[in-house]
């Protein structure tokens, strides 16, 4: 039977109507009662690029064309109905025994088995007859055309399936609706206003945690590595990436926006703005800010290299190479004027061959962007910004990571 399944997949992939996916998965959606907009789309399993193309063949051959809710060259959203569930299970017959006995096996089958339970318990649709489960297929990385595709891209970033800054997130703010979040549930703001009196009189008014277009990171996924620590769930937005283990985020002034994050072991007590990528081994001190691209006119995404130290309350508006230090309270922006003495310039030139010498020893911050081994400091006697070759080795406390 397994060979029959393989032949089915192979034949489908060679057919004229086969279209290779960038990503696909089944999502459960939350629908606003008044506007009917999608407030949230939750994917228990995300298949990215060439992952699980057998399940892609199953899903595409189980859907009903009349159930297509949205279709374009770049994405497709299809309603899950009874026919889809039963057809998919029939295709999956060779693997069902293993899936029933091991919940960690065949994750896409596990999703369909949960859909079967929803079918049996009459939960495929809400009380208004609207489908709560959708098959979502992303074909091309184009601007987001639906909430479902926006959530798929954010999840791909958070899981590390797509590198930070690699996906087209244009239009994402227009697709997502501002909602009141209580626990993992989004509430339509207009619905809350309309029903405020009744909800409060019956003591059913939800405890609202926050209002935003984005859910929090921990509301959508479990970190893949056990040594990732988030001490305050409100400080990390969905769409952030926290690396391959050892990331620690302290409470207080720390924050990570979507499409930003750390690549590995990192101590973060500061703010990692949108599109910022932080290298492994870097320590971001309390209240330190790394500027992003969402506002303020900065269109150049910032990267922080490996084994850097951003001191408390520092501001970094340029990219840093490996082994850099920005002292506490120091602001380094693209237009900042920084003095480098001639002997220190020679030391920096040893690790930055492209560095160009200025006769007056003054350099703009943007000229030092991405350079390795630079230590930025404010001269306490005259207030000048200075830079010199960093000789301090940045080592994180291994017991904390």
From Swiss-Prot:
Residues forming the catalytic site: 269
Chain sites annotated for binding succinyl-CoA: 271, 286, 289, 312, 327-328, 335, 364
A molecular function GO annotation: 2,3,4,5-tetrahydropyridine-2,6-dicarboxylate N-succinyltransferase activity
Pathway per the UniProt entry: Amino-acid biosynthesis; L-lysine biosynthesis via DAP pathway; LL-2,6-diaminopimelate from (S)-tetrahydrodipicolinate (succinylase route): step 1/3
Reaction(s) catalysed by this chain's protein: (S)-2,3,4,5-tetrahydrodipicolinate + succinyl-CoA + H2O = (S)-2-succinylamino-6-oxoheptanedioate + CoA
One GO biological process term: diaminopimelate biosynthetic process
Entry's localization field: Cytoplasm
Signal peptide (UniProt feature, chain positions): none
Domain of life: Bacteria
UniProt KW keywords: Acyltransferase, Amino-acid biosynthesis, Cytoplasm, Diaminopimelate biosynthesis, Lysine biosynthesis, Transferase
Main location as per UniProt: cytoplasm
Enzyme class (EC, first level): transferase
Function: Catalyzes the conversion of the cyclic tetrahydrodipicolinate (THDP) into the acyclic N-succinyl-L-2-amino-6-oxopimelate using succinyl-CoA.
Assembly mode: Homotrimer.
Family: Belongs to the type 2 tetrahydrodipicolinate N-succinyltransferase family.
Name recorded for this polypeptide: 2,3,4,5-tetrahydropyridine-2,6-dicarboxylate N-succinyltransferase
Taxonomic source organism: Helicobacter pylori (strain ATCC 700392 / 26695) (Campylobacter pylori)
């Amino acid at each position: 039977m397994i060979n029959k399944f393989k032949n089915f997949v192979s034949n489908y992939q060679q057919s004229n109507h086969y279209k290779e996916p960038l990503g696909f998965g089944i999502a459960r959606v939350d629908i606003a009662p008044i506007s009917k907009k999608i407030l949230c789309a939750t994917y228990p399993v995300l298949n990215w690029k060439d992952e699980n193309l057998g399940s892609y063949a199953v899903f595409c051959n189980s859907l009903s064309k009349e159930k297509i809710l949205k279709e374009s060259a770049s994405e497709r959203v299809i309603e899950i109905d009874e026919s889809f569930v039963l057809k998919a299970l029939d295709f999956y017959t060779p693997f069902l025994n293993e899936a029933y006995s091991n919940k960690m096996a065949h994750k896409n089958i596990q999703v369909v088995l949960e859909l079967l339970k929803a079918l049996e318990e009459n939960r495929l649709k809400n009380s208004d007859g609207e489908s709560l489960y959708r098959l979502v297929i992303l074909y091309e990385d184009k601007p987001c055309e639906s909430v479902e595709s926006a959530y798929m891209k954010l999840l791909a970033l958070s899981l590390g399936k797509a590198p930070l800054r690699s996906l087209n997130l244009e239009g994402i703010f227009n697709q997502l609706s501002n909602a009141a979040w209580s626990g993992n549930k989004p509430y339509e703001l207009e619905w809350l206003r309309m029903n405020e009196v009744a909800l409060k009189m019956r003591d059913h008014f939800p405890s609202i945690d926050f209002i935003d277009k984005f859910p929090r990171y921990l509301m959508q996924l479990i970190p893949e590595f056990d040594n990732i620590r988030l001490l305050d769930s409100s400080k990390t937005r969905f769409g952030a990436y926290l690396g391959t283990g050892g990331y620690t985020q302290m409470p207080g002034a720390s924050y990570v926006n979507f499409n930003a994050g750390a690549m590995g072991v990192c101590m973060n007590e500061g703010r990692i703005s949108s599109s910022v990528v932080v290298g492994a081994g870097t320590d971001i001190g309390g209240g330190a800010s790394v500027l992003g691209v969402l506002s303020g006119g900065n269109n150049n995404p910032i990267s922080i290299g490996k084994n850097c130290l951003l001191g408390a309350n520092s501001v970094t508006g340029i990219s840093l190479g490996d082994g850099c230090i920005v002292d506490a309270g120091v602001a380094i922006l693209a237009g900042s004027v920084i003095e480098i003495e001639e002997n220190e310039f020679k030391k920096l030139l040893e690790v930055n061959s492209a560095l160009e010498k200025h006769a007056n020893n003054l350099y703009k911050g943007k000229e030092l962007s991405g350079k390795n081994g630079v230590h930025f400091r404010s001269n306490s006697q005259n207030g000048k910004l200075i830079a010199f070759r960093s000789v301090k080795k940045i080592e994180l406390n291994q017991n904390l990571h």
